[in-house]
Amino acid sequence: MPSSTSNSEAAGSDAAATAATQAAQANAELASGAVGVPLTAPGSPLPGPGAGEHFVRPGFVRQTASDRPGVAQPVPVRDIPVQPWGLILLATVVMTALLIGGWEAYWRAYGATPGYRNSNGEWAEQRRRIDAGEGGKTVLIGSSRVLFDVQLPVWERITGERPIQLALQGTSSVLALEDLADDPKFTGHLLVGVAPELFFSGRAIRADVFPYYHKQGPSQRSGNWLSKHLLEPVFAFYDPDFALGTVVRRQPWPMRAGMHKNSDVRKLLVQDADRNSHMWRKVEEDPAYRAIARSIWLEHFGKPPPTMDTPQKLQKVIDTQIDRAVAAVAKLRARGVQVLFLRPPSIGPYYAFEQHVFPRATTWDVLLRRTGVPGIHFEDYPQLQGYDQPEWSHLSASEANRFTAALVPIIKADYWVSTAAPEVPPR
């Protein structure tokens, strides 16, 4: 028995010595770079099938902080392969330039030209003018018709004053009306555009511009400045309608059963640095593109949303928007602001849709009566009718100049006490 015990102990000692030797050899390989992963220290016990069993797994077992308490982990080192990095950088720059140049050439051939973006940052820049000492000026708010149809250079030529353009496409002017009503620094004249479909429904696809303006930070301002001065005047493709993601989304993808097409409105306008805007020439001159614009309007004339799918619901929505306008106008007039509503022209199916859903008698007439504010409706003035509107809703660029030249004298003569300089010749 003693002989057997001593043999077992000797065998165990030999096994432990062998394991220690193997671990030492493996760690020596690690030190020489033959193995790229740290191993356990020689003789360290690791969990295994048998208590106290020792083993080494070169390339798999890594020391951790728990194996070496109080000792910092080694910093991982990763070799960078030797490559012609200068040539790779040059090739990347050339490839990027070719792709950008190709994308720019494609959209220029399509008819695009460099122009300023109709962004929240651009709107906020104009809105800040009121709080920076220009609160007594004429301000234009409304939807896209005021943006397209009222031309600032023509207004300036007739009155000597260039208004501040704050109209927003696809957005009820009630929001801007309320925003200005809450700003005591605004004391000037206010022209409020009324597009029945938007004003009396409260629809506002650009509603986020108001919190953006009030919370705009330095980084957003600097980003808008860089965009406006370095990118927008140079690149024609730098427009949301030409973004690759937008182009992919508007492809004719198959639609699931029961879905109705609801396309985003395509690019329709070109904008200047101070948000003076006019219709893009492609809408006027390209019959195929004009047909696309019209077809998108027809999609929007379909089934009403659940909040307006009965006459009672619709009337409630209309009354709510008029209530909001009444409250905002009262604040403005209390501090001497002269307010004037404007219903710009529309034609064809668009006009028919507005007359059917938002007839004048239950919308426009009620708005004027309840607010006590005068208004100019294109139906009441022959000189505001008969203009070319390629996609039924907005005036062409040349017609917008003619419309503004007819509108401003009406405002001066019949509604606003003018303190501006006399008409100045065009520059």
What feature does the model see in each segment?
Residues M1-W85:
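N-terminal Lys/Arg-rich, disordered targeting/topogenic segments
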Residues L87-R108:
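Hydrophobic membrane-insertion alpha-helices, especially the h-region
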Residues R108-R128:
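Alpha-helical transmembrane signal-anchor/signal-peptide segments
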Residues G135-G136, E161-R162, F186-H189, A334-L340, ...:
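Loop/turn elements at helix/coil->beta-strand transitions in domains of secreted/extracellular proteins
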Residues I141, R145-H229:
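Membrane-embedded segments
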Residues V209-R335, V424-R427:
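Secreted/periplasmic serine-hydrolase-like ester/acetyl group-modifying domain
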Residues A328-E354:
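Active-site segments of SGNH/GDSL-like serine hydrolases
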Residues Q355-R427:
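C-terminal regions of proteins
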